[in-house]
Amino acid sequence: MAQTNPNYATPSSVRSVTSYPARRGYKQAVDPALDHVVGVDDAIDIHCHAHEGQQDALGVAKLATKSGMKGILYKTIVGRKNPAGTVAGVRQALESWCAEKNLLPTHLWPGSSVTQGFLSKIEPAWSAKQLKAGVVGLWMPNNTSANTLSLVGGKPSAWDKNADPKAHTEPLPWDEALKYGHYLLDEKGRLQPEIEEIFRMAHDQNAAIFFGHPTKPEFHAMAEYSQKIGFKKGVVDHPFSPFVNLTIEEMKDAASAGLWLNFTFDELSPLLGIDPANMYKAIRSAGPEHCTLSSDAGEPLFPNSVESLRLLRGYMAAFGCTADEIYTMSTVNPAFIVGLELETKQRASAGR
């Protein structure tokens, strides 16, 4: 894939032409006094954050349960060294609470990064340990990727114990980004053997791999290797984000190559500002059967993950996705990624 620099965060004067008909035509009764969120029935969030300084893992699980969600995959959670163990504790607490409230608990799954932080080598043994413990999704490098450091910089305290913990660098030159961050390719532009081994492990254990924040060469190499080994659970997180930065045509190609496109509320948030009309165009181009909708929420500048999902689903419905397509992207496809068997792939209200 050639390097591209698309801009899908259209100016307000442009996006208002498509957004006003959408917002005026979409109706959803929302009572702010409710103790749950409407409009997220059966949804599975495959990208939820609950680590230090973010939303509470048990609290968001309770809200998801009350709101009728089917499940949450925690990308991050307090206790990152043992995410499966931490999620097991949250699950136990949720089940006890649900027994008191006579509610059916939402499913909870652990995810894990393939890294153990900046300056640490990516070791297959780490991922093998997480998969054995019950992790269902592995994330390639995100904030620790060389690509991220070259685009937005990072917190130098992560690689320099004497640095100000509140400091954040400017974007780093590529040679510095490579010094402190992770890069998945060898000197010949091929996936490092350790990365290929992790893909094979995930394939053998029916786990997903989220591609993280790759450069285009890294992305292309992961896509090719997924095809080579017949891997069906390669997920392209937030494809509009500057850390992935695909064009809509590239998203269509990725879907045709067997990858999942995981669109997120983060992309639509004011912090990234993607025009929801363009996200809808991407879904229509790639096909809802290749797409998922998730929150990528948890930080205090966002709504909680349950409300973020309501908003994301609402935006896509307002711009033209049908109820069946929303169900496919929010329930059927995420269920495949986390390995949940559904009783039916048809939404409960279909045919009524």
Briefly describe each language-model feature range.
Residues 1-107, 125-128:
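An N-terminally biased module of ancient metal coordination in phosphate/nucleic-acid-related enzymes
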Residues 2-4, 15-17, 306-352:
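Mid-to-C-terminal alpha-helical segments outside catalytic/metal-binding sites
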Residues 29-39, 58-65, 86-98, 122-134, ...:
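Histidine/acidic residue-rich metal-binding segments in metalloenzymes
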Residues 258-270:
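His/Asp/Glu-enriched short active-site or ligand-binding loop at hydrolase and phosphoryl-transfer sites
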Residues 48-50, 77-78, 113, 142-143, ...:
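Active-site metal-binding loops of divalent metal-dependent hydrolases
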Residues 41-58, 109-120, 185-190, 212:
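Active-site mouth loops of central-metabolism enzymes
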Residues 45, 60-83, 103-116, 135-145, ...:
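Divalent metal-dependent hydrolysis catalytic cores, especially in the metallo-beta-lactamase
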Residues 264, 288-305:
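Short acidic/histidine-rich active-site segments
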